[in-house]
């Protein structure tokens, strides 16, 4: 079972309520940085397996 659009909308609404409009851009920025670091780490892991 994947996430449907309604599930994603509910999660975003909960995040908005918890953090408020003022902190939301900072939270999204931190989340994006974390995802980028995770992807970079996965790429490094793949390159070490090939060696």
UniProtKB/Swiss-Prot annotation:
It comes from the Bacteria. Keywords: Cell inner membrane, Cell membrane, Membrane, Protein transport, Translocation, Transmembrane, Transmembrane helix, Transport. It is a single-pass membrane protein. Its main location: membrane. It holds the Pfam family TatA_B_E. It is found in: Cell inner membrane. The chain crosses the membrane at residues 1-21. The keyword Plastid does not apply. GO terms for cellular component: TAT protein transport complex. One of its GO terms (molecular function) is protein transmembrane transporter activity. One of its GO terms (biological process) is protein transport by the Tat complex. Part of the twin-arginine translocation (Tat) system that transports large folded proteins containing a characteristic twin-arginine motif in their signal peptide across membranes. TatA could form the protein-conducting channel of the Tat system. The Tat system comprises two distinct complexes: a TatABC complex, containing multiple copies of TatA, TatB and TatC subunits, and a separate TatA complex, containing only TatA subunits. Substrates initially bind to the TatABC complex, which probably triggers association of the separate TatA complex to form the active translocon. Belongs to the TatA/E family. PANTHER family: SEC-INDEPENDENT PROTEIN TRANSLOCASE PROTEIN TATA. This is Sec-independent protein translocase protein TatA.
């Amino acid at each position: 079972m994947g996430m449907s659009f309604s599930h994603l909308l509910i999660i975003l609404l909960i995040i908005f309520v918890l953090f408020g409009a003022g902190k939301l851009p900072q939270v999204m920025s931190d989340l994006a940085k974390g995802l980028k670091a995770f992807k970079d780490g996965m790429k490094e892991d793949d390159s070490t397996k090939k060696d």
